[in-house]
From Swiss-Prot:
EC number: 2.1.1.-
Record protein name field: Putative S-adenosyl-L-methionine-dependent methyltransferase Mjls_1071
Keyword Nucleotide-binding attributed: no
An example molecular function term from Gene Ontology annotations: methyltransferase activity
UniProt xrefs under InterPro entries: Ppm1/Ppm2/Tcmp, SAM-dependent_MTases_sf, SAM_mthyl_Trfase_ML2640-like
Alphabetic keyword roster: Methyltransferase, S-adenosyl-L-methionine, Transferase
S-adenosyl-L-methionine as UniProt keyword: yes
Family under the similarity heading: Belongs to the UPF0677 family.
Functional note: Exhibits S-adenosyl-L-methionine-dependent methyltransferase activity.
Binding site for S-adenosyl-L-methionine: D130, D159, L160
Superkingdom, natural source: Bacteria
Length: 304
C-alpha cells in the first residue's frame, strides 16, 4: 500500500515492519564471529514482532545468502553493511559522549536498543522518538525479558510529522545543552520537504557543540522501483510481502550534507566503500542496489 498523509503503523506493518528487517540484520551480525556489533536484544525483539521470515533470519534458521545462490556474495555484502551501519552509529554515539555530550535524541527509534546496550556515561539521558505503538511495543517487550536501560531513557511517543519538538521539550529536553542527534535509516521514508523541516527543527533545538549523524542516499533521487522489487523477489516467494517502493519517498531532494552545512553544521561523509575498508570487511559491489552508493554522514554544530 502506498504512503499517504497521516498514515500510521505498528511494528509489523508498513514502515514499522522495516524496523524488524533491520533488527533481524543486527541479530545476524551479532552472531558473526567477527564481532562487528553486539546487540543481544535484536533477536528477542524480532521474535516478538512475529513476522515469520524475519524471525527465522534472526534465529539463524534461514541464511539470507541462500535466497539466490548466484548472488550469495552480494547478499553477504548487504548483511555486512547492516552490521557496519550499526557500528557507524554506535561509534558516533560513543565519540559524542566521550566529548562530553550527555543528551541523546534518536529520531524514529524503531527497534533500536542502544539505550539498553551501549555503555553510556553516568548522567546520560537518551530520548527515543517514534509512533506510540512502536514505543509501547519495544518498552513492554524489553521489560518482559528483564532488560534495563544503561542510561536514563525517556520516550517521546509522537509521529515526526507532528509537533515533536514541543513533545521533546515536555519530556525534559534541554535545548541549552549539547545534543547527539541520530536519524538512522529515516530519511528515505520522509518527503523531501519533511526532510528539510526535520533538520530545521534539529538545528533550532541544538546548542553549540551538538552533533548529528544520518545517511545520504543518492539512489532515492532516481529510484528504480522495479529494480527494488526484483531485489526482494526471493523474499516474496518465501512469504514476505514487504513492498519497499511503496514505503519510500523518491525524487529530487536536497543533499543532506549541503543542507546541514547551510544551517551551520560542519559535516563529514564516509562513503559505504570506505566504511567497509575502515573495518577490514571485503566489499562486493552490487550494482542492482536501488539506493546507490550510500554515504554515512556526521557533523558538529557551531552556531547558536
Amino acid at each position: 500500500m502506498a504512503r499517504a498523509e497521516g498514515d500510521s503503523w505498528d511494528v509489523a506493518s508498513s514502515v514499522g515492519a522495516t524496523a524488524a528487517m533491520v533488527a533481524a540484520g543486527r541479530a545476524v551480525a551479532t552472531r558473526d564471529p567477527r564481532g562487528l556489533i553486539d546487540d543481544p536484544y535484536a533477536a528477542p525483539l524480532v521474535r516478538a514482532v512475529g513476522i515469520e521470515f524475519f524471525t527465522k533470519v534472526a534465529d539463524g534458521e534461514f541464511d539470507m545468502t541462500e535466497l539466490d545462490p548466484s548472488s550469495a556474495a552480494e547478499m553477504q555484502a548487504r548483511i555486512d553493511e547492516m552490521a557496519l551501519r550499526t557500528r557507524f552509529f554506535d561509534d558516533y554515539f560513543l565519540a559524542s559522549t566521550a566529548g562530553g555530550i550527555r543528551q541523546v535524541v534518536i529520531l524514529a527509534s524503531g527497534l533500536d536498543s542502544r539505550a539498553y546496550r551501549l555503555p553510556w556515561p553516568d548522567g546520560t539521558v537518551v530520548y527515543e522518538i517514534d509512533q506510540p505503538a512502536v514505543i509501547d511495543f519495544k518498552t513492554s517487550t524489553l521489560a518482559g525479558i528483564g532488560a534495563e536501560p544503561t542510561a536514563e531513557r525517556r520516550t517521546v511517543a509522537i509521529d515526526l510529522r507532528e509537533d515533536w519538538p514541543a513533545a521533546l521539550r515536555a519530556a525534559g529536553f534541554d535545548s541549552a545543552a549539547p545534543t547527539a542527534w541520530c536519524a538512522e535509516g529515516l530519511l528515505i521514508y520522509l518527503p523531501p520537504e519533511a526532510q528539510d523541516l526535520l533538520f530545521d527543527n534539529v538545528t533550532a533545538l541544538s546548542a553549540t557543540g551538538s552533533t548529528v549523524a544520518t545517511e545520504y542516499v543518492p539512489g532515492i533521487l532516481n529510484f528504480d522501483a522495479e529494480k527494488a522489487r526484483a531485489a526482494s523477489a526471493q523474499m516474496r516467494e518465501r512469504g514476505l510481502d514487504l513492498d519497499m517502493p511503496s514505503l519510500v519517498y523518491h525524487g529530487e531532494r536536497k543533499h543532506v550534507m549541503e543542507y546541514l552545512t547551510s544551517l551551520g553544521w560542519t559535516m563529514a561523509g564516509l562513503p559505504r566503500t570506505d566504511l567497509f575498508a575502515k573495518h577490514g570487511v571485503p566489499m562486493v559491489a552490487h550494482d542492482n542496489d536501488p539506493l546507490g552508493e550510500i554515504v554515512y554522514v556526521s557533523g558538529t554544530y557551531q552556531n547558536r
